UniProtKB/Swiss-Prot annotation:
Name this polypeptide is given: Photosystem I P700 chlorophyll a apoprotein A1
Main location: plastid
Entry's Gene Ontology cellular component terms: chloroplast thylakoid membrane; photosystem I
Disulphide connectivity of cysteines: none
Organism encoding this protein: Ephedra tweediana
Higher taxonomy: Eukaryota, Viridiplantae, Streptophyta, Embryophyta, Tracheophyta
Transmembrane segments: 62-85, 148-171, 186-210, 282-300, 337-360, 376-402, 424-446, 522-540, 580-601, 655-677, 715-720
Topology within the bilayer: Multi-pass membrane protein
Residues noted as binding phylloquinone in the record, renumbered to the chain: 683
Functional description taken from the UniProt entry: PsaA and PsaB bind P700, the primary electron donor of photosystem I (PSI), as well as the electron acceptors A0, A1 and FX. PSI is a plastocyanin-ferredoxin oxidoreductase, converting photonic excitation into a charge separation, which transfers an electron from the donor P700 chlorophyll pair to the spectroscopically characterized acceptors A0, A1, FX, FA and FB in turn. Oxidized P700 is reduced on the lumenal side of the thylakoid membrane by plastocyanin.
Class of this enzyme: oxidoreductase
Sequence positions that bind [4Fe-4S] cluster: 564, 573
Pfam families reported in the protein's UniProt record: PsaA_PsaB
Length: 720
């Protein structure tokens, strides 16, 4: 095995930090002339490409920056656990999760609990939290605040290790360029992160989570439950709960795996006590994932010479109509970090959105399903993160095209062919957007008009002209009936949302029930299709035209972001790849807003609510989604106004502190937006007269103040 590192390449010194712009070529030439340097500093601090041309140096910076990122994540996690240990009512919640609300943020008594959620239960004074950490802690077997303390300290130790690793692999033993091999990276990430990660989590769940949750579900007092290490060290404790533990690993090696069926189950549905997935199902899932990925982590050929060669697979991939096929794609992935990143971000972003949809349909943690605020927060959080990450995929795809793309190695392959018929792709997408926009909006306009004219029988709704989502309903039905044929041992389908007549309630609250789909969902679904297609249109146009267009044939020379193609060429502003990312973000926001509105109203109308002793379910908004959401007016009146009025009227309720913060945040937002609306020229003129006054008094600064450039102004604008 070759030595793949370079020893002591860069000495550790803080002197560089005192030297302004040690990574900026413009600043290195001398002191900055104008205040624009501050903005450029923010824009370029992490743009390693602009600091150096050397791919090895860029790769090392990325590698060590990842350790820094991990350190920040560990510090953040540690903070969460510390808050749970020091400022939370976790132990009280654990003893009575249906009546006590989670809180991990104490407030000075002078503020008064009566303006902060009222009583969170158990006489605790604090703000109700909606991060979902309590259910995660219970699922992982944490029974006391002391354990949270220990985990928080562990997090800090890991953060320190990561910071050390980041420093060590840049200053002491920096990897050579030949060390960054795609096959090795794939193998290690598949086997290490996903394989061993899942295996260790499955192990933890079997030995710690399962027994502790079993006892908690049975109503045992958390203080009487043995500590995690006792379950690990003393097998007899486990055998009392799960007799098959007495057989050890014998059934595993003799392939008699059914012996383990009490810890590795395939039940489907939810645990009726906690409203979460069966923990034994989750263990089974992670064990299976671990096996798959440990095998997958040995698939690719490295210097050991066994396994698949990605290059060979790609180059063999040719169709009758696709020219050179995938030839040349391997070179793209091995020479451009941006290309790799774009691919990974697109996949990760899509997965994050899939997670958002699983958190409510298959709630993984105990008592998560009845904490509606947390459910709403988790859905919103994962949708937004997924949206941002997908936009990032388009951004890095465009940067790859501008900075890293080499057309000679990609002649007539699939990538080249996509670029060559980009006009057809974009014009088709454009037509799709127009079609979806007019038709989906048109259905609503029709309904509003008929409603206003008093002709409900002529509206598109479940009670008049039906537009049932028959394919979605067929899919739901398939999932309800499938387990009988595909998994005879399963007691329920994968999710109760598919249909059937299962209703899971915890305490007096609904955890989950079948979600019916009707005309209202069909209409809003097409709004989703419309907004997503527009986002894709903008992003894809930015990527496909990043290097050149009919308007600006030499776009690649202007770079990833530029305001206009110089003076004297009107109509060439805001055409850079960066500007497409900017516009894409706005449409991503449009798309996700509609998704969150749909989710929020649908769940409150058809799923969430209380159940009476007679078994009658009363939903939060009384099942009004199907009839109200088929008109724009219904959305405005019965969703936006009905929900916003609670915030506006909150000043006299137990939520008043939140209402005031909400108001204050909007003031800050509007105040700063005001400066963006008033135009750059106005500010530049104002600045210059102020500079003139300073000059008169001989107190003028050496660095000349300057208004934001177009790109900078739009960057601040998009943050708003």
């Amino acid at each position: 095995i070759k030595i793949m590192v370079e020893r002591d390449p860069i000495k550790t010194s803080f002197e560089k930090w005192a030297n302004p712009g040690h990574f900026s070529r413009t600043l290195a030439k001398g002191d900055p002339e104008t205040t624009t340097w501050i903005w450029n500093l923010h824009a370029d601090a992490h743009d390693f490409d602009s600091h150096t041309e050397d791919l090895e140096e860029i790769s090392r910076k990325i590698f060590s920056a990842h350790f820094g990122q991990l350190a920040i994540i560990f510090i953040w996690l540690s903070g969460m656990y510390f808050h749970g240990a020091r400022f939370s009512n976790y132990e009280a919640w654990l003893a009575d999760p249906t009546h006590i609300k989670p809180s991990a943020q104490v407030v000075w008594p002078i503020v008064g609990q009566e303006i902060l959620n009222g009583d969170v239960g158990g006489g605790f004074r604090g703000i109700q939290i909606t991060s979902g950490f309590f259910p995660i802690w219970r699922a992982s077997g944490i029974t006391s605040e002391l354990q949270l303390y220990c985990t928080a300290i562990g997090g800090l130790i890991f953060a320190a290790l990561m910071l050390f690793a980041g420093w060590f692999h840049y200053h002491k033993a920096a990897p050579k360029l030949s060390w960054f091999q795609v096959e090795s990276m794939l193998n290690h990430h598949l086997a290490g992160l996903l394989g061993l990660g899942s295996l260790s989590w499955a192990g933890h769940q079997v030995h710690v989570s399962l027994p502790i949750n079993q006892l908690l579900d049975a109503g045992v007092d958390p203080k009487e439950i043995p500590l995690p290490h006792e379950f690990i060290l003393n097998r007899d404790l486990l055998i009392q709960l799960y007799p098959s533990f007495s057989k050890g690993l014998t059934p595993f090696f003799t392939l008699n795996w059914s012996e383990y069926s009490e810890i590795l189950t395939f039940r489907g549905g939810l645990n009726p006590i906690t409203g979460g997935l069966w923990l034994t199902d989750i263990v089974h899932h992670h064990l299976a994932i671990a096996v798959i990925f440990l095998i997958a982590g040995h698939m690719y050929k490295t210097n050991w010479g066994i396994g698949h060669s990605i290059q060979e697979i790609l180059e063999a991939h040719k169709g009758p109509f696709t020219g050179e096929g995938h030839k040349g794609l391997y070179e793209i992935l091995t020479t451009s970090w941006h290309a790799q990143l774009a691919l990974n971000l697109a996949i990760l972003g899509s997965l994050t959105i899939v997670v958002a949809h699983h958190m409510y349909s298959m709630p993984p943690y105990p008592y998560l399903a009845i904490d509606y605020g947390t459910q709403l927060s988790l859905f919103t959080h994962h949708m937004w993160i997924g949206g941002f990450v997908i936009i990032g995929a388009a951004a890095h795809a465009a940067i790859f095209l501008v900075r890293d793309y080499d057309s000679t190695t990609s002649y007539n392959n699939l990538f080249d062919r996509v670029l060559r018929h980009r006009d057809a792709i974009i014009s088709h997408l454009n037509w799709t957007c127009i079609f979806l926009g007019f038709h989906s909006f048109g259905l609503y306009i029709h309904n509003d008009t008929m409603s206003a004219l008093g002709r409900p029988q002529d509206m598109f709704s479940d009670t008049a002209i039906q537009l049932q989502p028959i394919f979605a309903q067929w899919l739901q039905n398939t999932h309800v009936t499938a387990p009988r044929f595909t998994a005879p041992a399963a007691t329920a389908s994968t999710s109760f949302t598919w249909g059937g007549n299962d209703l899971v309630t915890v305490g007096t609250k609904v955890a989950l029930l079948p979600i019916p789909l009707g005309t209202a969902d069909f209409l809003v679904h097409h709004i989703h299709a419309f907004t997503i297609h527009v986002t894709v249109l903008i992003l894809l146009k930015g990527v496909l035209f990043a290097r050149s267009s009919r308007l600006i044939p030499d776009k690649a020379n202007l770079g990833f972001r530029f305001p206009c193609d110089g003076p004297g060429r009107g109509g060439t502003c805001q055409v850079s790849a960066w500007d497409h990312v900017f516009l894409g973000l706005f449409w991503m926001y449009n798309a996700i807003s509609v998704v969150i509105f749909h989710f929020s109203w649908k769940m409150q109308s058809d799923v969430w609510g209380n159940i009476s002793t007679q078994g009658v379910v009363t939903h939060i908004t009384g099942g009004n989604f199907a009839q109200s959401s088929v008109t724009i007016n219904g959305w405005l009146r019965d969703f936006l106004w009905a929900q916003a009025s609670q915030v506006i009227q909150s000043y006299g309720s137990a939520l008043s502190a939140y209402g005031l913060f909400f108001l204050g945040a909007h003031f800050v937002w509007a105040f700063s937006l005001m400066f963006l609306f008033s135009g750059r020229g106005y500010w530049q003129e104002l600045i210059e007269s102020i500079v003139w006054a300073h000059n008169k008094l001989k107190v003028a600064p050496a660095i000349q103040p300057r208004a934001l450039s177009i790109v900078q102004g739009r960057a601040v604008g998009v943050a708003h």
